From Swiss-Prot:
The gene is chrnb2. Residues 229-235, 292-421 are cytoplasmic. The keyword Glycoprotein applies. It comes from Carassius auratus. GO terms for molecular function: acetylcholine binding; acetylcholine receptor activity; acetylcholine-gated monoatomic cation-selective channel activity. This is Neuronal acetylcholine receptor subunit beta-2.
Amino acid sequence: LRSDFLLGPERYNKLIRPAVNKSQQVTIGIKVSLAQLISVNEREQIMTTNVWLTQEWTDYRLVWDPNEYEGIKKLRIPSQHIWLPDIVLYNNADGVYEVSFYCNAVVSNTGDIFWLPPAIYKSACAIEVRNFPFDQQNCTLKFRSWTYDRTELDLVLTSDFASRDDYTPSGEWDIVSLPGRKNEDPNDLTYLDITYDFVIKRKPLFYTINLIIPCVLITSLAILVFYLPSDCGEKVTLCMSVLLALTVFLLLISKIVPPTSLAVPLIGKYLMFTMVLVTFSIVTSVCVLNVHHRSPSTHYMPEWVKCVFLHKLPAFLLMRRPGRSNVRERFRRKHQRKSFSSHQDGDSFFLTDDPGRVCGAWRVGDLPEGSEFRQRVKVRHDQDVDEAIDGVRFIAEHMKIEDDDEGIIEDWKYVAMVIDRLFLWIFILVCVVGTLGLFVQPLFQSYNTPVAEEVYGDF
């Protein structure tokens, strides 16, 4: 039947399209069945798919009467022996336009031909990186005849959506919908193609675990910079370590997403946001260290600084400055009492023996008036006491100056602590608001926005 009747050279030529005359169109029914979504290369912007390209048409030359051939109604004929429509993938990315395997074609006695060749296509796909890794892509497969135009071949969709009956799920992508459409150009009557839209949504778990969560944890370490005491000397070191870690993650992102200037990926925006925050923390840490190590000999504390950073801001930030220690306060009160007593008893003197032991103490006024001993004691007393008082006053003034300087130094340290606490709350607020502002909307759209079945098909 096949060799003697159907495919005889006197009645069949596989190079001629099956049309009765040159003006007749040959209708080709096309349907795509997705077997596997192999990969989506974001950097090269290529989607690799394993599909079955169903093609159906009628060849009037391959008609026979089943009663004459023992009731045979179908034949499996090698596709190389019959005319085939030259349907190719127009938007391929590797130069392979045709199918991978030329399987047999199923020919019915009515001339209807069913051909289902498998193919692995690498198609160009414009990757939208704006919401990466919570993104949704729309990659297309565009099919059309390579040599026949619309006046010779009419391409029709046998189904509005690509089939997923034999689809193997992907570990990285979810299939949202696979709608197909027929495209015609009103300005070009010869143009015709069949386009399938592969609407796919990324599964973000891998990138959430390996990129987003580590970035958030590393950024949270920058918060500790403002809680770290200035005396430890590691504030800037911690900031630089965090900034270096974020730079490494930024280099990893640059190797994944395509090098496009049309949009910045979401994870890239977050990394840049955190790097700006960490850089800001470095600047503030340097300023805080500068304030912390100030002294009265180098800087003067203005009154507005005392008012704002020593009184108003600590109360607003719920900070309470500890008072002076009890030991130091008792020492100051004792020193004040002794100074007062020295002024009240300025005319008293002590008598000591040779080893320096105190034998007694008298006031000059207690001695008899006009006695020689009183005159000598008074002269000696005036000279020694004046020298002692001058020395004590010098020491007291020196201690008072040191105490005042130490108090001013403590005030500068407290100002630095208040600035640290202020920027700590600012950093936490900006970090939380910025993170939620960047991720909540794409995450909400990715998981909670339903896709209409009548528009996008089954999912």
